[in-house]
Amino acid sequence: MNRFVYITEYLPKRYSASPEQDNARRMCWDFKKGILSDRVRDAFISKVRAIQNDSGKRCMVCFIPASTKEKTILRFSRLSSALKTEGFDVEEHAVFNTSDREAEHINGKSDNPTRTFGFNESKIRERIIILIDDIFTRGRTFNQTAAKLKEMGAIDVIGLFLAKTVNPDYHQADRGSNVINSEYEPDVEVIYLDDMEFEMEYNQYPIYNPDEEYMAEDLDQFDPDFEDLDCYDDNPENELY
């Protein structure tokens, strides 16, 4: 079972959002476009430091590639530089694009979304890896990438995401609880951010509670290129998920 940390929550566009949830959406859209706010940068730095301290060993930071090399560089280059400045071990070439792939919401879902990823075994072996990406929904790409890293000798792989998708339809609202319907439980374990305590996701549902209002550029008409599987559902309109 793979573990992951996330910083905030992403509510899909089809749901009416509070001002705080709308701010979180815009923060995610900005990050997709390569905009790294001070708030997001500092949150990633804090979580990488917490994971490394919890592991008791020096970790290596890697990134899950986007659909193209260009998008991977755009999305993660500023964060990579910020983490290096803080003294973390960041390796952009441990997991990398071997070729560009068409976005899965255009071309259909692949049985193996990592088919266009390359892995540098010499950089992976005997390392604890913090694997960063933007949004976690079902976790298929993360789990398959983590499995490949472990196959190549990684000691452990811990995911770190800017946001986790929340979907009110999948909660047992009739019970008045925050228990996630077992049908939609991903094969992961959440590391909660407050104290790094390991809890199963269905035992506690974290509520988004931002410390400050997030102001982004005017993105009211922006339809972000959420090209990866974890941002889409199966509907024909390709609504953000």
Predicted regions mapped to residue ranges:
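Short loop/turn motifs enriched for small/polar and acidic residues
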Residues: 63-67, 162-163
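Glycine-rich phosphate-binding loops at beta-strand->alpha-helix junctions
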Residues: 65-75
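PRPP/pyrophosphate-binding module of the type I phosphoribosyltransferase fold
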Residues: 93, 97-204, 238
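DE-rich, low-complexity intrinsically disordered acidic tracts
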Residues: 188-241
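Acidic beta-strand-to-loop metal/phosphate-binding motif
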Residues: 60-65, 130-131
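Active-site-facing substrate-recognition patch
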Residues: 1-60, 95-125, 165
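A generic structural signal for alpha->beta connector loops
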Residues: 58, 87-90, 154-156
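Glycine-rich phosphate-binding loop and adjoining helix at the ATP-binding site
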Residues: 74-90
